[in-house]
Amino acid sequence: MKKIKIALIGNVHDHALANFGVLKSHPEVFDVVGVCNLVPGKDESSYANEKTFNMQQLLDMDELDAVLIESGKENEVYDAQKFAAAGKALFIDKPGSSNCDEYDKLLDIVQNKQLPFALGYVYRFNPMVQKALEMQKNGELGTVYSVEAQMSVRHDMQKRRWLMRYKGGMTFFLGCHLIDVACTFLGFPNKVLPLGFSSGHDGLTSCDVGGALLMYDHAQAYLRTSAIEVNGYARRQIVINGTAGTVEIQPVEYHIKNVKCEDNMLAVAKITLQKDNPPQWDEGGKTQESQPFARYTPMLMQFAAQIRGEEGYVRPLEYERKLMRTIVAACGADNEVFIPENV
């Protein structure tokens, strides 16, 4: 199997090191040629032995197959446009852009050149989310009429101050994962109601409690994400309600203690089906635990399969276009969420 020659562009995104680690851990799949545009002092030792290039050198490198773009939400779409124009396969960390129009331009290039393209939405590969989606497709849940999801954490003041650079703050930062889940199950909404606000904690004005209500003719999705929630990580939850069954995923993912291999996470779901005649006023669900899984590896392996021509896009490009518009609307914006004066 021919190795995929790939380069890392930027290291700003929170998942940059983890995704880069996957590339380095699988030399049978990826040949990391080097790095570009790294922020000095950020995880410096992890990239110390990598060859450094400037952008033009990589754009001119005929043998380069792909790039992993981790240059930050307001920058990544512009970097991606350049490499797409050069015909390189693209893995971009979520959500792919802070500007809808620029994102559309990128996807136009990807579509015209038929380039491999992937985004870092981790829940797309979560085994219990995938199970719920399979159950929906099989009709086991009946008609899905509601998705409720929470994805919270306790961030320090520096991170919460950083949120000020984006309209919608946490809705943009982590809420994009939840919006992706909701739109996967329900399609795209007729109306989006932004629900994010600033708690004012520590005197900051950033939108540190994000949220949105996605409204449909006969369904809705309520999504919430907080940067100040005590024990927020452990309370992350996705609930899919259908007329014939409910899937409650909690925890959505948690680390298996003392396991150092890639497959070091588990997800748990409680599944309740009407056909099993569950009691009306008592517990009737059956709890299932996933097999151990890796958070980042499946995304990059699917990307590699795209490059080899073995698989297609995880989601259609038209879905990705509409998803970006929905995320930006949930942030209370029309086209752009980046606020440069707040940097």
Set out the residue ranges of the language-model regions.
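Predominantly a Rossmann-like dinucleotide-binding segment in NAD(P)-dependent oxidoreductases
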Residues: 123-203
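Contiguous beta-strand/loop segments that form the cofactor/metal-binding neighborhood of enzyme cores
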Residues: 173, 179-257, 297-309
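A short helix->loop->beta-strand "cap" motif at the edges of active sites that frequently abuts
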Residues: 86-88, 113-115, 218-219
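Rossmann-fold dehydrogenase core element
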Residues: 105-122, 143-147
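C-terminal glycine/acidic-rich active-site capping loop/insertion
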Residues: 122, 239, 243-318, 339-343
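N-terminal Rossmann-like dinucleotide-binding module
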Residues: 1-47
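C-terminal helix-rich "cap/oligomerization" subdomain common to oxidoreductases
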Residues: 1-3, 8-9, 36, 66-69, ...
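Beta-loop-alpha module in the N-terminal Rossmann-like domain of NAD(P)-dependent dehydrogenases
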Residues: 47-109
